[in-house]
UniProtKB/Swiss-Prot annotation:
This is 2,3,4,5-tetrahydropyridine-2,6-dicarboxylate N-succinyltransferase. The gene is dapD. One of its GO terms (cellular component) is cytoplasm. The active site is at E261. Catalyzes the conversion of the cyclic tetrahydrodipicolinate (THDP) into the acyclic N-succinyl-L-2-amino-6-oxopimelate using succinyl-CoA.
Length: 393
């Protein structure tokens, strides 16, 4: 058993110099929910704590414990192993110098091992240790969840994680609270469950759980309807998600205090101080943006029921009810062209009366409007300040 912190650091150095050690991108220990009909099917992985480009000492200790219990790390991009009694005992013996300090926010990996040491072998069967060695497309449910946690906890930036194929890996299940239930099992047991009064309350049927089933938001973040935010979304402190027409998909979210009353689709990112009005839609990479992810800058206003399909810079306004798409043509006066060019000195487009939406992508200080008499779509230099109510954020 390791007795001192110096002994611990010496052991870590020794492990990291060994042939079996692989430095991970991310790792963690998860409790898994298994299929009711097929226990080999993993429906969900819950991580009490994840490590993302950090805590390499714990990674070394865990890998040594795996090595000592006969597990060999492969050359794949990820590795998932059962947590056994022997693994826990080995890992705990290496963590001895930190055990008394492992409370509160200190030494979360040690806290996880301490908790696991209180479980028997049958209980440990529902725990997995997961390593990601590179940001490749995930191959397991556990790896998908580890990446979703990285996004939702803010340890990985939005759009920085490879989630290719994740939707196909996750199983479509019925969610009752935090419990996933196989649909086949429900069908096979429907009669008995209903006759006995034990049929569960089904909140949703989806491959992704809700954000709040796994993540504790910042104190000044408000989510008024748990169904409106999917796991894998990222909400910066101060974000408010109202009920009704709001929705935030996975790998999408906010970078600061934002009022969300509309839809932020997959891979869309909204800057601080912006307001996504009631029913407004920011298109995702699969819904009309030619695969280009959309960023909305700071202090923008997307009016109620508007549609935004191009990236916007700071201080932009999209009036209620209009669609700003890549191919939409907007009239611009020569005077407004000069003002917009002054606000965006890097923009080197020559003046013309009509610009397509894609030609205006990423510019700041734009105001999109539809003429109420002619129906003509127009864009001009915004002269309004968008400012959120500080009391609400």
């Amino acid at each position: 058993m390791i007795q001192t912190k110096d002994d611990f650091f010496a052991l870590v150095n020794e492990i990291q110099s060994s042939a079996y050690y692989k430095e991970p991108l991310a790792f963690g220990i998860a409790r898994v929910d298994r299929g009711q009909k097929n226990p080999e099917k993993i429906l969900q992985a819950t991580f009490p704590f994840i490590n993302w480009k950090e805590n390499y000492g714990s990674a070394a200790i865990f890998q040594k414990a795996l090595h000592e219990t006969g597990k060999l790390l492969n050359d794949e991009s990820e590795a998932v192993y059962d947590v056994t009694k022997n693994f826990v005992a080995e890992a705990l013996s290496y963590c001895n110098p930190w055990i008394e300090e492992a409370i509160g926010d200190a030494h979360k990996n040690v806290q996880v091992i301490k908790y696991l040491s209180t479980l028997d072998e049958e209980e440990l069967a529902n725990f997995k240790i997961v390593f990601l060695f590179e940001d490749a497309a995930p191959k397991s449910v556990e790896a998908v969840y580890l990446k979703l946690y990285a996004l939702s906890t803010g340890k990985a930036a939005l759009r920085s994680v490879n989630l290719n194929g994740a939707f196909g890996i996750l199983h479509n299940v019925a969610w009752s609270g935090t419990t996933p239930i196989e649909l086949d099992w429900l069908r096979e047991n429907e009669l008995e469950l209903k006759m006995s009064g034990q049929y569960p309350v089904i909140d949703s049927v989806d491959k992704f759980p809700r954000f709040l089933q796994h993540i504790i938001p910042a104190d000044n973040t408000r989510i008024l309807d748990a169904a409106k935010v999917r796991m894998g979304a990222q909400l910066a402190a101060g974000t408010t998600v109202m009920p009704g027409a709001s929705y935030i998909n996975f790998n999408a979210g906010t970078l600061g205090p934002v009022m969300v009353e509309g839809r932020i689709s997959s891979s869309a990112v909204v800057g601080k101080g912006s307001d996504v009005g009631g029913g407004a839609s920011i298109l995702g990479v699969l819904s009309g943006t030619s695969g280009n992810p959309i960023s909305i800058g700071e202090n923008c206003l997307l009016g109620a029921n508007s549609v935004t399909g191009i990236p916007l810079g700071n201080g932009c306004i999209v009036d209620a009810g209009i669609a700003v798409l890549e191919g939409t043509k907007f009239f611009m006066s020569e005077a407004d062209y000069e003002k917009i060019k002054e606000a965006n000195p890097e923009w080197n487009a020559e003046y013309k009366e009509f610009f397509k939406g894609r030609e205006l992508a990423g510019l700041s200080g734009l105001h999109f409007r539809q003429d109420s008499t002619s129906g003509q779509m127009k864009v001009f230099r915004s002269n309004k300040e968008v400012k959120l109510n500080e009391e609400l954020h």
